[in-house]
Amino acid sequence: MIALIDKYFPDLTRPQRGQFEALYALYADWNTKINVISRKDFDQLYLRHVLHSLSIAKVCPFAPGARVLDVGCGGGFPSVPLAILFPEAHFTAVDSIGKKIKVVQGVAEGLGLANLDRKSTRLNSSHNRESRMPSSA
C-alpha cells in the first residue's frame, strides 16, 4: 500500500514511510469504534483518502513553520497525511463532532505526530489565525 504513496512522493524518509504504513492499522482499529470511513471504502484507504489528501502538496507545499487550519477535518483527512508529509509545518484539525476529533487524536498519538493539534469546536467559536486549507467539509 505504501507503494502507491511512494509512486507520487518518492523522497519520503524512513520515519514517514513507517507512519504512512501504520495508518491502515490505526484507522482500521478506530473505524471499528467510530465509523469515520465507509466500511465498503476502507480497502481503498490509501487511494481515496491518503493520496487524495496529499494531492494538495503537489501544488501547495507547506514551508517549515507554516501553520495550517483544517476546518471540518472529520476523521483527520487531509490533516493527518499532510502532517506526516510536512513534519516542519504545524496543523490544527478542527471539527464540531467530538468523536471525530477523538479519532484524530488517537491516530495522531499512535503515529507520534507532534505537529498536529486537535480541537472540537465550531468554526464560529474558534479564533485561530491560521491559514485555512481545503477540506472535505
Each model region followed by its residue ranges:
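Conserved SAM/SAH cofactor-binding pocket of Class I
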Residues: 54-122, 129
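Single conserved hydrophobic/aromatic residue that forms the stacking wall/gate
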Residues: 123-137
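Short, amphipathic alpha-helical segments that act as regulatory/interfacial helices
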Residues: 24, 54-57, 137
